[in-house]
């Protein structure tokens, strides 16, 4: 069975990624289970951070590595929180504090448009010169009051007008079909299943 190390310790992300890669028979292991600490994310773009995380995990384990960097970008805030989404309210990181800061930042704003952005990077080995890079988005609006118990991050405040509900009200299956990460991973799964890239095998 093929094996990939996931360059994240975020439980929500790990659950989504494991579920979507399962049909390919790929064994997903977390970097923390292999004693690998999280990489720094010093860059100002999502793709640079994802590349840094994937390379760190692959070099440390000798396995192919999959990393994503994602966040929420709000039109009225000129794209913020962006790459700082996970630490928008500072340390210690907290979804509740991040959401509170976002709602406060949008107080009095009529433009509530926002989108989740995700970039996924697959490295076949630590020195892979041609990483697979896939991007996708998920558009919605920010609402002041949280609704729903599911998801993570900004999901309770991310309203989907076409569905009349927030991301936190979706089942895991629904979310995987339409979310930024779900769509990007689905494209990666299709690419791997069609052998459009080098097979994912341990090196």
Swiss-Prot record:
InterPro entries: dITP/XTP_pyrophosphatase, ITPase-like_fam, RdgB/HAM1. One of its GO terms (cellular component) is cytosol. Keywords: Hydrolase, Magnesium, Metal-binding, Nucleotide metabolism, Nucleotide-binding. Mg(2+) binds at residues 40, 69. Binds 1 Mg(2+) ion per subunit. It catalyses: XTP + H2O = XMP + diphosphate + H(+); dITP + H2O = dIMP + diphosphate + H(+); ITP + H2O = IMP + diphosphate + H(+). Substrate binds at residues 8-13, 70, 152-155, 175, 180-181. GO terms for molecular function: dITP diphosphatase activity; ITP diphosphatase activity; metal ion binding; nucleotide binding; ribonucleoside triphosphate phosphatase activity; XTP diphosphatase activity. SUPFAM superfamilies: ITPase-like. It comes from the Bacteria. Its EC number is 3.6.1.66. Its cofactor is Mg(2+). One of its GO terms (biological process) is nucleotide metabolic process. It is an enzyme of class 3 (hydrolase). It holds the Pfam family Ham1p_like. The active site is at residue 69. Pyrophosphatase that catalyzes the hydrolysis of nucleoside triphosphates to their monophosphate derivatives, with a high preference for the non-canonical purine nucleotides XTP (xanthosine triphosphate), dITP (deoxyinosine triphosphate) and ITP. Seems to function as a house-cleaning enzyme that removes non-canonical purine nucleotides from the nucleotide pool, thus preventing their incorporation into DNA/RNA and avoiding chromosomal lesions. Homodimer. Belongs to the HAM1 NTPase family. This is dITP/XTP pyrophosphatase.
């Amino acid at each position: 069975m093929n094996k990939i190390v996931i360059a994240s310790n975020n439980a929500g992300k790990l659950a989504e990624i494991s579920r979507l890669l399962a049909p390919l028979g790929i064994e997903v292991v977390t970097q923390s289970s292999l004693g690998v600490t999280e990489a720094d994310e010093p860059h100002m773009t999502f793709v640079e951070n994802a590349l840094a995380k994937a390379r760190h995990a692959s070099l440390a384990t000798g396995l192919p590595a999959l990393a994503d960097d994602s966040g929420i970008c709000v039109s009225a805030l000129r794209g913020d929180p962006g790459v700082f989404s996970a630490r928008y309210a500072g340390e210690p990181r907290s979804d509740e504090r991040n959401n509170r800061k976002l709602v406060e930042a949008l107080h009095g704003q009529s433009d509530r448009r926002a989108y989740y952005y995700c970039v996924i990077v697959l490295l076949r080995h630590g020195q892979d010169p041609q990483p697979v890079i896939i991007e996708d988005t998920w558009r919605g609006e920010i609402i002041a009051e949280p609704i729903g118990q599911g998801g993570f991050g900004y999901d309770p405040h991310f309203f989907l007008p076409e569905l009349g509900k927030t991301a936190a009200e979706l089942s895991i299956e629904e979310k995987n079909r339409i979310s930024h990460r779900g769509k990007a991973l689905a494209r990666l799964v299709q690419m791997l299943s069609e052998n459009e890239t080098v097979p994912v095998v341990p090196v």
